[in-house]
C-alpha cells in the first residue's frame, strides 16, 4: 500500500524542526515549528514495517506537520550517507477521502528500512520497493523522497539530537 501526496509550492523560509525524545520508550518526534493550518483532514498516517516497526506521519489541515518514530526498525549505520543536494521546497498534502476538516487515520503496511550516518544525526527511512525521483524539503530538517507518481518513498531526518544518555 502506498501513500500518495500532492505538492503545494512553498516560497517561505523552511520551518524549524522541534525534536523530542521520550526517554522511557525511545520514541522520537520531529514536529514542524510553524502552526499554519489549512483546510483539510487532521490525524495520522501510520506506516507499519514488516518487521514490526512504526513510523507515523502527523497530518494537520491536510498537510504533513511531523514524523514520529514509534518503533524503530534495525538502523544500518553507513560510513557515508549522502543527503540529497537537489531538493525543492514544498508542502505535502495528504488527500482525504473523508469530510473536509475531519480526522483521518490511515495505516499502511510496507517495507521500512532505516539507515543513518555514523553519528546517527542523519537518518533516512526508505519505504516500499519503488525508486525515488525527487526530494522535497518540507522543513529545515525534514526531507521527503517521492517517486514519479508522488508516492512517498523515503523520509530524511537531519540534525537529529542524540538520545538522552547516549551523548
Predicted regions and their residues:
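Intrinsic disorder/low-complexity detector
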Residues: 1-42, 46, 55-57, 66-123, ...
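Extended, Lys/Arg-enriched charged tracts that mediate electrostatic binding to polyanionic substrates
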Residues: 125-131
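Residues that cap or initiate secondary-structure elements
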Residues: 63, 73-75, 131-133, 161
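Mixed-charge, glycine-accented linear interaction segment located at domain edges/termini
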Residues: 132-167
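Short solvent-exposed loop/turn micro-motifs enriched in small/polar/acidic residues
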Residues: 48-50, 107, 136-139
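Short, structured motif recognition centered on aromatic/hydrophobic residues
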Residues: 53-68, 123-125, 144, 152-157
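Well-ordered beta-strand positions
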Residues: 56-60, 115-117, 136-137, 145-147
Amino acid at each position: 500500500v502506498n501513500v500518495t501526496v500532492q505538492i503545494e509550492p512553498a516560497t517561505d523560509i523552511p520551518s524549524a524542526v522541534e525534536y523530542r525524545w521520550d526517554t522511557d520508550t525511545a520514541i522520537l518526534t520531529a514536529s514542524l515549528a510553524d502552526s499554519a493550518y489549512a483546510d483539510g483532514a487532521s490525524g495520522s498516517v501510520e506506516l507499519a514495517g514488516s518487521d514490526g516497526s512504526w513510523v507515523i506521519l502527523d497530518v494537520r489541515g491536510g498537510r504533513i506537520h511531523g514524523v514520529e518514530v514509534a518503533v524503530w526498525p534495525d538502523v544500518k549505520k553507513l560510513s557515508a550517507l549522502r543527503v540529497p543536494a537537489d531538493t525543492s521546497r514544498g508542502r505535502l498534502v495528504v488527500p482525504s477521502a473523508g469530510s473536509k476538516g475531519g480526522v483521518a487515520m490511515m495505516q499502511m503496511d510496507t517495507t521500512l528500512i532505516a539507515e543513518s550516518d555514523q553519528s546517527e544525526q542523519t537518518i533516512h527511512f526508505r519505504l516500499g520497493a519503488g525508486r525515488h525521483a525527487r526530494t522535497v524539503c518540507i522543513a529545515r530538517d525534514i526531507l521527503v523522497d517521492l517517486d514519479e507518481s508522488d508516492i512517498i518513498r523515503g523520509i530524511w531526518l537531519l540534525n537529529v539530537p542524540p538520545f538522552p544518555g547516549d551523548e
